[in-house]
């Protein structure tokens, strides 16, 4: 389907072939597969590596590639990326401002991005990726309260979800603290 929509794109099932002449190599695999995938690619210093493998640090990524000076990005989206509403975290090593802007522009197409230091990735992931689950637990509890008060489940979900979206828009658009909006 991609080939039909974008006839100039080259597709292959061979990772080595795919990476050989790519400007940007995006690796989106489970963390335990990253070394097995990266080692045979023989990436060049001029290429940009983008890893979506959670928990794999820059030093390990550089070691697996054999190119410690190449630009490397760690990118952590959340599940809302499926709705183009992700809060995506980006950390960069050996990357120029132009390369950072490029990656930010790409992932801004699927939500919002924030460039943060690698040292903050774990904490930020708890807020953004695990945050989705926390928010959905709140939605589930609020829905249940509405249902117990006689509101139809479908209506309760819509009410809570829209209230949540409204609260998010208030915070994002006004850039205020939640306590300001509560009062």
Residue ranges and their predicted role:
Residues 14-90:
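Rossmann-like NAD(P)(H) cofactor-binding subdomain of soluble oxidoreductases
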């Amino acid at each position: 389907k991609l080939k039909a929509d974008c006839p100039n794109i080259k597709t292959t099932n061979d990772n080595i072939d795919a990476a050989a002449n790519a400007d940007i190599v995006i690796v989106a695999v489970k963390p335990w597969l990253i070394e097995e995938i990266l080692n045979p690619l023989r990436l060049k210093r001029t290429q940009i590596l983008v890893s979506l493998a959670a928990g794999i640090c820059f030093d390990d990524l550089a070691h697996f590639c054999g190119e410690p000076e190449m630009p490397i990005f760690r990118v952590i989206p959340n599940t809302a990326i499926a709705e183009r509403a992700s809060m995506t975290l980006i950390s960069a090593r050996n990357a120029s401002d132009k390369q950072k802007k490029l990656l930010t522009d790409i992932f801004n197409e699927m939500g919002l991005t924030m460039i943060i230091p690698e040292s903050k990735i774990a904490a930020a992931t708890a807020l953004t990726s695990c945050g989705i689950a926390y928010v959905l637990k709140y939605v589930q509890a609020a829905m249940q309260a509405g249902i117990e008060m006689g509101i139809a489940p479908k209506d309760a979900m819509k009410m809570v979800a829209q209230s949540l979206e409204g609260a998010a828009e208030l915070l994002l658009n006004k850039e205020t603290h939640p306590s300001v909006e509560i009062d």
